[in-house]
């Protein structure tokens, strides 16, 4: 929030796109004087978010919206900030930043995280995996160029260290594998999903020096 230069002294209107269960949404509501529209296409995530918001005393600041990120019903120049953490890949980075720009007020801030290569060359095994899973993975300079082409001034960039992936994402996911399989009766489809996630985790543990989530902060011009 400091890097983005968000003004804590005035009310802000924020859209959190692909909010999930609201970890970032609730943090923003606590830290800023803000009204937040929390968007996700899974209603069960939004229900969990609402429970968390009430328990944290910020429910009145948050409105949930169950829809897809590529069919947002927002008005032009409606928001001061668009925030999207670990979700824009569902739409594609370039498509997302291009489509969402019109929802920002002049000078509004875009804050998004995106899987990003940390090195110019990668092992073939890793490159092949991400070419199939998400071909838009690229180095930060390429992502910054996309922002510039679509009417933004890049303000800051940083990447998340390995412990963020492991402690906050992969380890909690691993802890749920057995319960997930049990809940789905050890079905073939469930086992395929778990095997796929295990493969992704193994790749990250092996090649964490080559990629991470990059956080991009940009200003609409």
Outline where the language-model segments fall.
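A short SAM/SAH-binding and catalytic strip from SAM-dependent methyltransferases
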Residues: 81-94
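Short alpha-helix
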Residues: 136-151
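Short, glycine-/aromatic-enriched active-site segment of Class I SAM-dependent methyltransferases
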Residues: 115-134
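Class I SAM-dependent methyltransferase SAM/SAH-binding core
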Residues: 15-17, 21-71
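Conserved Class I S-adenosyl-L-methionine
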Residues: 158-221
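A short glycine-rich, Lys/Arg-flanked "PGG" loop and its adjoining helix->strand segment in the class I
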Residues: 95-109
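Conserved alpha-helix/loop element of class I SAM-dependent methyltransferases that forms part
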Residues: 1-10
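A short acidic, Gly/Pro-enriched loop at the edge of an enzyme's catalytic core
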Residues: 70-81
């Amino acid at each position: 929030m400091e890097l983005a230069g968000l003004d804590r002294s005035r009310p802000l209107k924020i859209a959190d796109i692909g909010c999930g269960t609201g970890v970032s949404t609730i943090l923003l509501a606590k830290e800023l004087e803000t009204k937040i529209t929390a968007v996700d296409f899974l209603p069960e995530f939004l229900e969990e978010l609402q429970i968390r918001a009430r328990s944290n005393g910020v429910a009145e600041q948050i409105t949930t919206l169950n829809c897809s990120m590529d069919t947002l019903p927002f008005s032009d120049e409606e928001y001061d900030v668009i925030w999207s953490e670990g979700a824009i890949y569902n739409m594609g980075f370039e498509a997302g930043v291009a489509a969402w720009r019109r929802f920002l007020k002049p000078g509004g801030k875009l804050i998004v995280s995106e899987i990003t290569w940390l090195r110019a060359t990668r092992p073939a095994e890793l490159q092949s995996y991400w070419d199939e899973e998400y071909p838009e993975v690229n180095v930060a300079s390429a992502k910054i160029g996309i922002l510039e082409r679509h009417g933004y001034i890049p303000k800051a960039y940083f990447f998340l260290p390995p412990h963020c992936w492991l402690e906050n994402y992969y380890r909690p996911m691993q802890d749920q594998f057995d319960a997930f399989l049990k809940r789905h009766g050890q079905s073939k489809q469930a086992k395929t999903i778990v095997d796929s996630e295990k493969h992704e985790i193994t790749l990250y543990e092996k090649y964490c020096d080559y990629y991470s989530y990059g956080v991009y902060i940009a200003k609409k011009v």
